[in-house]
Amino acid sequence: MSLKVGHMAPDFTLLTDEWKTVKLSDYRGKKNVFLAVYVLAFSEGCTQQMRAVQAGIDSGRIPTEDTAVFGVSLDSPAANAAFAEQNGLHFPLLSDMNHKMLKAYGILKTYSVENEDYQWALRANIVIDKQGIIRLIDEGDNAVDPNTALTLCTTLHKQPSSN
């Protein structure tokens, strides 16, 4: 991953599963941001990861009053909407169909199969504080379980705001 904890999070503008625009910089100074990046809607690991994020919201481990929560994938808004409905997800799922955000964050992998290149998102949980600084990057198979990110969201919630 090219970005590291302590780096400023690159801005992005993406569409939600409800075809609304979300811009990361709109949250700067207002809310922490939890990005749960998943590989492919409806796949087993991604379903498990997104359901665990929803459980974190439902249990209060992600304090949504000061933490914005988003799933992010290469899937279309329509695919994400169907995925959210099927799995009872009540947080926005963002579509990075042009791959710009995932590439900027260094979590886009290219695979070559029979001289054809295919790009996939790498599974990751990323927590960005209110100042726009990356506080956690948890990638790979570990990210199926967002427990580390949930704990950090709770910790950031308890810290006094500097804004």
Report residues per predicted region:
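Chalcogenol-based redox active-site neighborhoods
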Residues: 1-163
